[in-house]
UniProtKB/Swiss-Prot annotation:
Complex formation: Hexamer.
Entry remark concerning the domains of this protein: The N-terminus is required for oligomerization.
Family per similarity comment: Belongs to the phi29likevirus single-strand-binding protein family.
Protein name: Single-stranded DNA-binding protein
Annotated organism of origin: Bacillus phage GA-1 (Bacteriophage GA-1)
Role this protein plays: Single-stranded DNA-binding protein required for the elongation during viral DNA replication by strand displacement. Displaced viral DNA strands are transiently coated with the ssDNA-binding protein and therefore protected againt nucleases. The latter is then probably removed by the replisome that performs lagging strand synthesis or during the events that lead up to the recombination process. Has helix-destabilizing activity since it removes secondary structure from the ssDNA in replicative intermediates.
Keyword flag DNA-binding: yes
């Protein structure tokens, strides 16, 4: 038996205070926090896909090598968002056991190329674009042209999108 002293961190159990379809308000360690609940979105779900599109989407969502460009490698470039997919996930900190919700966002351009990120800011910007640009399913989608930008955050640089125009050819 060793005579080592170990510092043990005590944390409170998180208590859910309230919940909406978009957020969970929790009380944890003496503070209130709002945790986002991410939705799965797929702009192609309203139409029948070709075999090639289905194969590409499967490989994209399965993480196949070369199926998407990391968004941080595309900073400064402009992208016409023809289609998009968002996939929520939960990760667990192995040291603390704390769960954190996240979301993967895939933007698909007019050439069928995908750009991927786990940036929460991009997810929320995409949702605001859905309000601004309409919906695929009802034919009101105006294809936005966005610039991929790097933004300063408390934990380093993050990704986001800046609306720069609309694609006139649909």
């Amino acid at each position: 038996m060793s005579n080592e002293l170990k510092q043990v961190e005590q944390t409170e159990e998180a208590v859910v205070v309230s919940e909406t379809k978009d957020y969970i308000k929790v009380y944890e360690n003496g503070k209130y926090r709002r945790k986002a609940k991410y939705q799965q979105l797929n702009s192609m779900s309203h139409r029948e896909l070709t075999d090639e599109e289905e194969i590409n989407i499967f490989n994209l969502l399965n993480g196949a090598e070369g199926s998407a460009v990391e968004m941080k490698r595309a900073v400064g470039s402009k992208v016409t968002i023809v289609d998009f997919i968002t996939v929520p996930y939960t990760k667990i900190d192995e040291d603390t056991g704390v769960e954190e919700n996240g979301v993967l966002t895939y933007l698909i351009n007019e050439n069928g190329e995908a750009i991927a990120t786990s940036s929460k800011a991009v997810y929320f910007t995409l949702n605001r674009l859905l309000i601004q640009c309409g919906k695929h399913a009802d034919g009101t989608w105006k294809r936005p042209i966005v610039e991929i930008i790097s933004v300063k955050q408390t934990n380093g640089d993050g990704m986001d999108l800046k609306l720069v125009g609309f694609d006139k050819k649909k």
